[in-house]
Amino acid sequence: MDRRIFGLENEYGVTCVFRGQRRLSPDEVARYLFRRVVSWGRSSNVFLKNGARLYLDVGSHPEYATPECDSVPDLVTHDKAGERILEGLLVEAERRLREEGIAGDIHLFKNNTDSAGNSYGCHENYLVGRHGEFSRLADVLVPFLVSRQILCGAGKVLQTPRGAVYCISQRAEHIWESVSSATTRSRPIINTRDEPHADAERFRRLHVIVGDSNMSETTMLLKLGSTDLVLRMIEAGVVLRDMSLENPIRAIREVSHDMTCQRRIKLANGREVSALDIQREYYSKAVEFVERRGGDAVAKRVLDLWGRTLLAIETEDLELVAREIDWVTKFVLIDRFRLKHGLSLASPRVAELDLKYHDIHRDRGLYYRMERAGLVERVTRDLDIFEAKSVPPQTTRARLRGEFIKRAQEKRRDFTVDWVHLKLNDQAQRTVLCKDPFRSVDDRVDKLIASM
């Protein structure tokens, strides 16, 4: 696929505290957060004029689904725009709490686990052709995705019966199947539920739910860009060595608990390899592929960071990527904090630091304090993120949805939209079906907008 449609869905952890004590239940916090949304959208499940979807997911987790993007840097920008939109709701909700005499700070965390052991996700979406054999795609991808956490894990201090350990991935402990149609009960690596949100005869949506939510823009770029390159190789018929794992679910935990990434995991054919070996295999094939086929600046940046991350792990010189890879950035931060204050990894102050890294409030979150201090690399710019809060991507179907919503709101017209349908709720009940996610111009939508 020369052009691919990408999308990201992030669920956020939410809490309201006053002097360190929980003040409101997650349900109550969510109600305050979404009050403004419900007042204009008459629902806690809405599409926005930038083409994105904002809603309350199971368990009172705010979720932001980006509009369809056709480039990875665009997707990073729109994912960050989702953070800013939620930060705006947070500030508004805190103001309303104060007006009602309730003291407390609301925190939104872009992470994947809470203190009670619940998990919530970051779901990646990649459009693939319908003609390919989906089971083969999954077979090749599972070993890649199990080992990919060494590139893009968000890092976590995990309290175990044997003491605290630093894990590479937050999500790894909560994955129970390789491939399945469920998302919550069994939490697979790849979700096979067939909902393309596009022409089902031409397209299929690959729904990857194994990844961690990332604060780092560069980690996000690597996560999405490396996966796109592996998909391109599969689509082009590149022969990849069989890396099928004997037990992917055991392997994903073993990889997460081994910061050296050298621990051997068993393949289905009896061989034993490390996560580093598996990633090296995919990486070297991707380098050859791009050299042969040619690649744009994004592919080259992805390959550069991919190679440097593997080198940093191999040589145990994590500082090489401490500005670019979430789990490394956070580990270095925690390590320095512990040394400075003489703390063990099990210290509550370390747990607090771990959580603060993911706080999306730019005045409180540790990641954003590091960003302001110039301690992390970037992919996008604040100006582009600000624009993406209200302007959809201009080269995908999201543009049509965004324009329709914007005009309907300006004209105070009642409307219903989803990923594929645009509908005016007037007597004629006019509906336009947009089945091609690559199409950003459509006469039928123009006519519908002009009729308002």
Curated annotation (Swiss-Prot):
It catalyses: ATP + [prokaryotic ubiquitin-like protein]-L-glutamate + [protein]-L-lysine = ADP + phosphate + N(6)-([prokaryotic ubiquitin-like protein]-gamma-L-glutamyl)-[protein]-L-lysine. One of its GO terms (biological process) is protein pupylation. Mg(2+) binds at E9, Y55, E63. Keywords: ATP-binding, Ligase, Magnesium, Metal-binding, Nucleotide-binding, Ubl conjugation pathway. One of its GO terms (molecular function) is ATP binding. ATP binds at R53, T66, W419. Its EC number is 6.3.1.19. Pathway: Protein degradation; proteasomal Pup-dependent pathway; Protein modification; protein pupylation. InterPro entries: Pup_ligase, Pup_ligase/deamidase. PANTHER family: PUP DEAMIDASE/DEPUPYLASE, PUP--PROTEIN LIGASE. Belongs to the Pup ligase/Pup deamidase family. Pup-conjugating enzyme subfamily. NCBIfam families: pupylate_PafA (TIGR03686). Catalyzes the covalent attachment of the prokaryotic ubiquitin-like protein modifier Pup to the proteasomal substrate proteins, thereby targeting them for proteasomal degradation. This tagging system is termed pupylation. The ligation reaction involves the side-chain carboxylate of the C-terminal glutamate of Pup and the side-chain amino group of a substrate lysine. This is Pup--protein ligase. It comes from Parafrankia sp. (strain EAN1pec).
